[in-house]
C-alpha cells in the first residue's frame, strides 16, 4: 500500500463522504479516516502474526467515543472518558455482527478493529462512518478478510424511504432501520418501527441493500488503488485420520443423543458420548492439541446431525414442528410491593419483568455524543449464570446484556404513552430466570405484562419471537421460537417484536451468503403468526392495563404556571422549592413552558404542595376578596397575609365604618379578617379595605329591611 496520503470521495444521501488513507496510524495493518459531512472517524485494523491456541475466532471490535468530538469536557473529578457509554457498546456490536461472518472457518489469529470518533456532525451518522471505516481498514490491510461490507440507515417519511436521515428527518420517520451486508447479501439488520407492516419492513431492507451495493463498489475502488496483498494464513484443521476415527467411534451414539427432547437430558446424553471418546484418547496419552481436535470433531458431528434432521427430516431437537411455539405460561402481580410485575415462561425460557414508575426527575441523564440529553423509558436486562445452571462470577452487565436490554427498549418504546398523557418515568428490569433460547423476546413479553399490571396505558401490547433458519444446499427450514441449540447451530437468528398491527423491532444476524428475499418474506410472515399466538396468550392473562396504579407507586399531579413565575417557585438558590419539598416530602419537576409535576406516594402531600405553589404564583387582582391573617400591626394600619408570602396593608382609615383611634381597638395580631383589594400601586404594594366590605354588608342589610317594610 502506498504511504502517501490519498483521498477518495462519494456522495451519500446528499452529503459528501471522503476516505483518507496513507497519513494516519500507518503502523496498523490497515487504517482509514472517514469524513462524512463534519463527522470524522479513524478506523484501524490490526492482527496477530500467529494463530492463538483457542477454539474460536478472537475478534474484538471497539467503537470509541471521545467527548472532544462534540466540544465537551467529561464530567466528574477525573475529567477523562471512562467506561464506554451504552450507545458506544451498541455501536461496537452493530459493527462486529456483519464483519464476523466474513472470516474463514479455522482462522484463529487475533484481530482488533478500533474506530475512534473524532468529530461529530449530528446529521451525519458516526456509526455508519465507523462501519464503512472498519470494513475498509480490514479490506486494504493484509488481514484475510472476505469483505468488504457496508451499512446504511433507512427511514420512512410520508411513505417515502430515506437513506441516512438527518436528525430532523428521524423525528418524522416511523422506521429506524440499520441494514448491513455484502454486495450479494444482507447479513445484519437492526430496526425499530412504529407498528409498521412486515411487507414495508422488507421493502426498507431491500432499499437499504441497494445503497450498500454502491458503497461496496466505492470500497472496491479504494482497495484496488491502495490495498495490500493478503497474508497467507494457515487455517486450523483437524487431522483427517483422527476425524474418521472419532466419527466411527461416536457418530451413531451421538445421533441418538441428539434426539432426546428435554434440554438437560439431551445435554447429559451428548456429554456422556463426548466423555467416553475423550477418555479413550486420554488413555492413549493424547496431547492437548489432539484432545482439542477431538472436541472440535465431536462439535461438528452434533452440528451436522442437528442441521440434517431439521432440513431433511424436518425434526427439531425437542420434537416440535417448524412453526410450533413451545408451551406458554404467564402470571402478573406476583411481587406485592413493586409497581407492576410479569412472569413469562416459554418452554425452558423464563423471564420475570418488573415495572417501576418514577417522577419525571428520575429520567436517565445521557452524557454522550448524541443530541438526546435524557430518556424517560428504560429497559434493563439481566442474565445471571443460574439461568443456565452454571456458576460464574457476578459482574456488571456485559455487551450482550446491554444489547438485549436495548432491543427490548426499542421494541416497547413505540407503545409507551406520551409524557403529556402519562407524566411518569418508566423503568423495566427483566431478570432471566431460565434460559433455553429467545430470552430477549421473553423479556419483551414479560415487560408488556409488567407494564399492564402497573397500569401503564400502553398504546398496544407487544410480544416478541425469535425465528431461525437452517439451510443445507437447496433444502431449508424456517423455525419459529428457536431454542438455544437451534440458535447456536443454525444459519440465522431473526428476532421480531411487535403488536397485532405491525413490527416495532427487528434484529437479524445471518451466518450464510445468498439469503433470498423470498426466504426473508416467509420468515417475517411466519413470525407474525407466532407473535399473534403469543399475544393472544398474554391477553388471556391480563386483557388491558389496570385502571389504577399500585398503592406504592407515586401519585403525580400536573399544574401549569406562568413561565415568568418559575423563578418565584424556585426562589434564590432553590431556597423556596427546597422549603416546599422539605415541608411536604414531594418531588417537584418544572418544565420551561411552566408545566409543574408534583409527585409522592401521599396524595394529601401532593395537594398541599400544589396549594403552596398556587399561592406563590397567584396574582392579586383589584376587586378580589380574601380572608387573611393579621401578621403585623403599626400605628398607621394592619398588615394582612392574603396567601403565602403575599401581604397587603389595611390603612387605619379602612379598618371600620367609624373613625378608629387605635388599630389595636379593631384588630390584633393573629386575627382572621375579610378584606377587599382596592388598589395595587406602581411599586406593587397592595392596599386593602375592611371598611368597604362592612359598608357593602350594611347596605345589603338596609336594602333587606326596606324590602321587608314594603311587603308589609
Curated annotation (Swiss-Prot):
Chief place of localization: cytoplasm
Cell location: Cytoplasm
MF (Gene Ontology): 3'-5'-RNA exonuclease activity; magnesium ion binding; polyribonucleotide nucleotidyltransferase activity; RNA binding
UniProt key word Iron: no
Gene Ontology CC terms, in alphabetical order: cytosol
Catalytic activity: RNA(n+1) + phosphate = RNA(n) + a ribonucleoside 5'-diphosphate
EC numbers: 2.7.7.8
Source organism, top-level taxon: Bacteria
Function: Involved in mRNA degradation. Catalyzes the phosphorolysis of single-stranded polyribonucleotides processively in the 3'- to 5'-direction.
PANTHER family xrefs: POLYRIBONUCLEOTIDE NUCLEOTIDYLTRANSFERASE, POLYRIBONUCLEOTIDE NUCLEOTIDYLTRANSFERASE 1, MITOCHONDRIAL
Protein name, as recorded: Polyribonucleotide nucleotidyltransferase
